[in-house]
């Protein structure tokens, strides 16, 4: 909302947008706000928040003669938008929840226009609570709406004004008998009517009764009824102490008047002067309990609240109320102001738990019966006269303006807004700016009560009328949803965030409301609705429902909230979608309450230039755990789009598309409809397709159905087995999508064009917000940025804080002697309670949570968009690319590339490495930046596949099971030369002598191909680690960079580096690229992917420990290790600490450093041989060489073996660092039998 742009309602720019509260008012509600006694507290700013608006509103109340009052309903009808309001409110502390509800209501009432001269209450409902009847307004033209009942003493003013209640007085010709006086009126006019049992009676002119005698209506029941959703439609105006049926007749009226119904009068209708309301007293009247059935001692006077106390009472029975079910007692003070107006204020008194008023249901029924009398016709009608039949036979007549132009509940809501605007902001003799009117309207649009929404509902114009208020609050206690921890909690100090949020929702769109052409050509045969498909939030209308869906899917901002009803973290990309979600709760009778607001801008390239993809059918996706509607973020070559996933309980299989030309009858075999994988018999072709597409357990001996050779996730073991044979080109050629058995000549064509099998990909669903991402890198970045909390930990004590200033203040107050120290950043996992000190550890920890979150997504063959459902992708192909199954030439030219190729989409290449490993696009960076591999390492598969690629792919391979598959036409070539010829002849592409089997790249030499496969497809990088950096493993992409780093950072000459380390710096140079050395290198490389643990030993190279330091640095004992390390590191008198890698000029300096920093004292022994000083203790090596030596691996029972995953480490420090990557939550789950390795 906030985008309504109807020209005649520019001055109402937010009347049906955010009528509840303004940005300046969203953060001021607190128990410290106090007002003066008697309801005349300090005037608060109206919704706009400036004093000028208050003065203008007061002037509007004091001067009833306004040029704009000529017509009560002279405004044209804007688009019908049932108002849905969103307010971000604060909570101070949980124990103040009860007081906060009252205070917030007070502020909202004041924002709605209460002034010293004449408070105008508003029956707003904030934070899920309905407000009580507001105080009285002296504006005579205030139609009966939720902004307060407007009535005044016209005898005092001496003017002939529009009296809303004149028609309900006794007419001499009809009912000369007056009403008997009330039995109990303690002070002048306050009513305390007894309970009643007369049925409700309300009669039109014919005299049939529908309303009960108003003199017998208890105030508690009437007040409890006053905030029903029907009056939020603009039909009646309620006042304090009056029911919806009899709203507006004061409690202090003379005997001929009752607390009866207040109806909207026809424009310009003058009330007869026979029924002015005279206030009997100008001093504050006696306070008495009128809000509840039971009586209790009055409480001390508190601030006037015309919006919260009775709201609490009403919300006690509401399903959405978070407070206790105790009925709230209120007392109403009637005060005659100096100008002759009577003002009522409502204050809350303590009450004991008692049953609510038993006759509220009857009030609801009577209200419903009355509202059904208002006809809804497309043409204007004259005033309708209705009469109230009282219990003693007295009949009161009144004129009701028919709801003639209200087509649905939204327009009724707008009518209420327009009348409320006139009731408050139209001054006499002064021109009021649209801004002032708008600010007043924001506080006066009527709200609804959840209880009434649940219990009643009525039909108006053939449509269901519901309330339209939505409250977005910060609950007193944190939401229990899975995403509660993520995001920043709104507090009083975050007023700028709340203000920005309200400004966004209240902002006026500079563009006019879109109106489509609803007159299509006759030959189109389109049946369009009369008003098109309209967004109820902003008023834009569209010709097609798909256009409306795209309108809701546009990306203009990122709003994250925690919906307390859904108990989940939700992400919205525009305010219309946010308010649409609120409307869904409203339609169920609930009031949306949210917390933990986080707003972020959306990048320009993600905001524009991307087609909005929405599902056009309620299509099926595999029934995975998750919400019913969630956005999909597909990433491919920078394109990001959003979509909507609709989960359907019964999944309909997607049948193959018809081929052009049609396939011959012998192309496929569908004779027996028996699954060739599991021998299950199916009934027909659709049953066979459903058998292959339904979710099922993984294949035997496998933990998932993710193909290790291509980035594809299959639904079940039958589909997985059939897909595996497509890589080996073995019979039977069974389609993994539909289960058909095909001939080899037609198999690839069927997979490519009919079933679009190669469009499957692996996606990852965020466990916190259920957003689906196309790559593991993107979801890890999303979780770290959106859901993980970062704390500033005190370096002295275990305290941690959310902000650096708080940590600094803690240091200043608690540890004044350590002010020079800085707080440490720690990172908390959003999916468990594990805390990490380094981001790489947290990123590695995510792998354990993301394995169960893998889902199957579908990539468009012609563009980089991803879809959660195959049917949605087919609709996208049909509507966007205009050819259904786009020719696969476009696939090769577009971003899709070879569908079996993981290189075209780096974020999804991870599956080919380890079923969910991170992408290798950062493979050239240091290991601090690279992401760790998956905890499922299928290393035997890697070795086997790498052997195929390294040998057969280079030597030609014969016709082995490897072969080459064309990424453009998916044709399979057993020989390398045949593949090169095919690419040049069929597609005009020049391919080098050594093409890669997993992507389109080709190379001139076999080593280049092997390096490409190792780095890009297996994720095993050839890195050059620095053995002198012990605080963190530093790796480099080339030997030259490593040597420069050692020379500059550690001060070692280049000669020592080259002579001492030889070929062991590079993990296998070109001279040792083949043979056993390559296998050793692969083993060590595959173990070096984890950034925070050292690699386990493998085998020893030539030149063992005693080769004078020219061999690799893997030793059987710490003494031999230190001897060789010192021989390498000490050159020209330079001493280096073996614990931290720092270099020193003398052994004495090194000794002092080791004693001060590492607490290692001198000890006799071999230290002198090591050059460490006399008697200095030799530190054990903290780092080990990845090349591997002949030192044995730790035994399974060795204390250096990880008890969780069995990984062996060579030092307790490395074991401890590695063990922290698992997290305690993961370890507990594994010990309980629910975790995966």
From Swiss-Prot:
Q: Where is this cross-link: Glycyl lysine isopeptide (Lys-Gly) (interchain with G-Cter in SUMO2)?
A: 286, 336, 372, 384, 397, 422, 435, 439, 451, 464, 955, 1044
- Looking at the UniProt record for this protein, which Gene Ontology cellular component terms does it annotate, in alphabetical order? cytosol; nucleoplasm
Modified sites of kind Omega-N-methylarginine: 1061, 1102
Q: Where are the zinc fingers (C2H2-type)?
A: 533-552, 705-727, 764-787, 792-815, 827-849, 858-881, 964-987, 994-1017, 1135-1158, 1200-1222
- Where is it mainly found? cytoplasm
- Composition skew (Gly residues), residue ranges: 1060-1074
Keywords of this entry: Cytoplasm, DNA-binding, Isopeptide bond, Metal-binding, Methylation, Nucleus, Phosphoprotein, Repeat, Transcription, Transcription regulation, Ubl conjugation, Zinc, Zinc-finger
Residues modified as Phosphothreonine are 377, 901
InterPro entries per the UniProt record, alphabetical: Zn532-like, Znf-C2H2_11, Znf_C2H2_sf, Znf_C2H2_type
Query: Per the record, which residues fall in region Disordered?
Result: 1-151, 163-331, 879-957, 1052-1117, 1166-1195
Q: Where is the composition biased (Low complexity)?
A: 914-926
Localization per record: Cytoplasm; Nucleus
Q: Which GO terms describe its molecular function?
A: DNA binding; zinc ion binding
Residues modified as Phosphoserine are 104, 142, 228, 243, 252, 254, 266, 271, 374, 433, 495, 1058, 1083-1084, 1086, 1107, 1184, 1191, 1211
Ranges of Polar residues compositional bias?
93-102, 136-146, 225-245
Summarizing the function annotation, the protein's role is: May be involved in transcriptional regulation.
Give the family per the record: Belongs to the krueppel C2H2-type zinc-finger protein family.
- Oligomeric and partner information: Interacts with ZMYND8.
What protein name is recorded for this chain?
Zinc finger protein 687
Q: Which organism is it from?
A: Mus musculus
